[in-house]
């Protein structure tokens, strides 16, 4: 699992598992972020080696993982992802909160306040140095803009970098399929649940809706 760039993730990510060996679900939640460090996380920024945290892009502030562009003059397609690698998960329920804040550094409208969680993600150790996004299925976060140039303003959309996704028996016709969510403004925490059943079913839930 990886987290793509350009957002602030609040305090912790919690995850509940179904045992890979048993059909009995676990009610125990596991914190993926300790609120103090990036222990257990691996950074990959396009054009740089694994764990080269170029310009201190990923930092911990106020018990949150912050994606910071304070030291950037231009973006130059330096897409970044941060991967949780302590354990692999197959059947799980992921909970997190995110928000967008601050000014935007990118020029492309498609990328404006654009982030997400990359599910079924490619191993960061197998990603090419200049590769911008891991092969994955993305639960995409967008924020704070009613009239985007690409026409999509909802959050928790489904995007498919390098993958084909079957929705109700049909391969998704577009790279990104929009959700039915409302538009969430910047500087507002948004609660997200993503429920994954092996390689077959993914549920996206926003603010328990």
Regions found by a protein language model. Give the residues of each.
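C-terminal motif of bacterial Sec signal peptides marking the signal peptidase cleavage site
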Residues: 18-19
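Carbohydrate-interacting regions of secretory-pathway proteins
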Residues: 22-209
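Intrinsically disordered, low-complexity segments enriched in polar/charged small residues
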Residues: 14-15, 162
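Sec-dependent signal peptide recognition
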Residues: 5-14
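Serine residues within intrinsically disordered or low-complexity segments
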Residues: 2-4, 26
């Amino acid at each position: 699992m990886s987290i793509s760039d350009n957002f602030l993730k609040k305090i912790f990510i919690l995850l509940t598992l179904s045992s890979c060996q048993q059909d009995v679900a676990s009610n125990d939640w596991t914190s993926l972020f300790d609120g103090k460090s990036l222990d257990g996380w691996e950074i990959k920024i396009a054009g740089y080696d694994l764990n080269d945290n170029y310009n201190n892009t990923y930092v911990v502030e106020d018990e949150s993982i912050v994606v910071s562009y304070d030291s950037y003059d231009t973006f130059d397609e330096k897409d970044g992802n941060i991967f949780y690698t302590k354990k692999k998960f197959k059947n799980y329920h992921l909970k997190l909160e995110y928000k967008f804040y601050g000014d935007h550094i990118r020029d492309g409208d498609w990328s404006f306040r654009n982030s997400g969680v990359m599910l079924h993600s490619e191993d960061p150790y197998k990603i090419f140095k200049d590769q911008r996004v891991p092969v994955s299925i993305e639960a995409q976060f967008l924020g704070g803009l009613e009239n985007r140039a690409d026409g999509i303003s909802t959050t928790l959309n489904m995007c498919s970098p390098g993958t084909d996704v079957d929705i109700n028996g049909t391969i998704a016709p577009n790279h990104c399929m929009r959700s039915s969510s409302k538009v969430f403004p910047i500087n507002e925490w948004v609660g997200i649940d993503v429920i994954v059943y092996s390689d077959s079913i993914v549920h996206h839930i926003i603010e328990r809706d």
